[in-house]
């Protein structure tokens, strides 16, 4: 037997957690995610968005959303751009681990849409220019995973 999630979001409730740091990028990721959700049938009234200060704060609010029982999936969006210190490495590692563990802890799909880039240019490319929009891609993944995970509910 083959299991697949379909890409029709009608009736799904989705939470989105967005890091405010590097907002000129994260706002474009959010725009892409909202566009992706709506284009696939998720009603605007069924989408909740929570802004947090930065990427490091994303896992806590994503966990609270996932544990609330209100959402079929949670999308996490943020942007971490390498600077001159090791801060980038710590933030990227902790955010990735935190978000990755949430699906296992909560049984709700939590999608990792946090950009971790070497340069501002790379982040811009992934927020709606030549490399697509990772927010949109995260929305599609959330819809697919919400349906797929319900097959074992």
Swiss-Prot record:
Assembly, per entry: Forms an icosahedral capsid composed of 60 subunits, arranged as a dodecamer of pentamers.
The organism's place on the tree of life at top rank: Bacteria
Entries under CDD domains matching the protein: Lumazine_synthase-I
HAMAP family attached to this UniProt entry: Lumazine_synth (MF_00178)
Catalytic activity: (2S)-2-hydroxy-3-oxobutyl phosphate + 5-amino-6-(D-ribitylamino)uracil = 6,7-dimethyl-8-(1-D-ribityl)lumazine + phosphate + 2 H2O + H(+)
Residue positions binding (2S)-2-hydroxy-3-oxobutyl phosphate: 84-85, 126
NCBIfam families xref list: lumazine-synth (TIGR00114), PRK00061.1-4 (NF000812)
Lineage of producing organism: Bacteria, Bacillati, Bacillota, Bacilli, Bacillales
EC number of the protein: 2.5.1.78
Protein name: 6,7-dimethyl-8-ribityllumazine synthase
Residues of the active site: 87
One Pfam family recorded for the sequence: DMRL_synthase
Keyword presence, ATP-binding: no
Cellular component terms (Gene Ontology): cytosol; riboflavin synthase complex
One GO molecular-function entry: 6,7-dimethyl-8-ribityllumazine synthase activity
GO-annotated biological processes: riboflavin biosynthetic process
InterPro entries in alphabetical order: LS, LS/RS, LS/RS_sf
Positions annotated to bind 5-amino-6-(D-ribitylamino)uracil: 21, 55-57, 79-81, 112
Keywords (A to Z) from UniProt: Riboflavin biosynthesis, Transferase
Top EC group: transferase
SS bond list: none
Keyword flag Nucleus: no
Organism: Bacillus cereus (strain ATCC 10987 / NRS 248)
Pathway the protein contributes to: Cofactor biosynthesis; riboflavin biosynthesis; riboflavin from 2-hydroxy-3-oxobutyl phosphate and 5-amino-6-(D-ribitylamino)uracil: step 1/2
Gene behind the chain: ribH
Function: Catalyzes the formation of 6,7-dimethyl-8-ribityllumazine by condensation of 5-amino-6-(D-ribitylamino)uracil with 3,4-dihydroxy-2-butanone 4-phosphate. This is the penultimate step in the biosynthesis of riboflavin.
